[in-house]
Amino acid sequence: SISTNDITYVEVFDHNLVYHTTGGDYTVRGRLGDVYEQLDHDYFLACNRSFIVNLRYVTEICTDHVILNGTKISVSKSHRKEIQSRFSAFMDKRAEKV
């Protein structure tokens, strides 16, 4: 069992889900939409039809991509505004806790 806190991002590849975690990568059969429904939307965001990222690990947001742990992930046009606003809100919340 994988802790959601350890998931950096999830990608779908050839009908498989690849969970990229702080402890390594795990591949299982499944649908990205089903996984997204189960994750906490305060922390997890869909960047495009193939990737879900954990905001805890995002280090940079650009117009058309996000960077987390050195990995560049494309952001589709339809998700750009949501990702920028949700990331800003996430960072504001994080700053309040400090």
Regions found by a protein language model. Name each.
Residues 38, 67, 71, 77-98:
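Eukaryotic intrinsically disordered, low-complexity regulatory linkers and tails enriched in Ser/Thr/Pro
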Residues 1-68, 72-75:
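Conserved binding/recognition cores within well-folded domains
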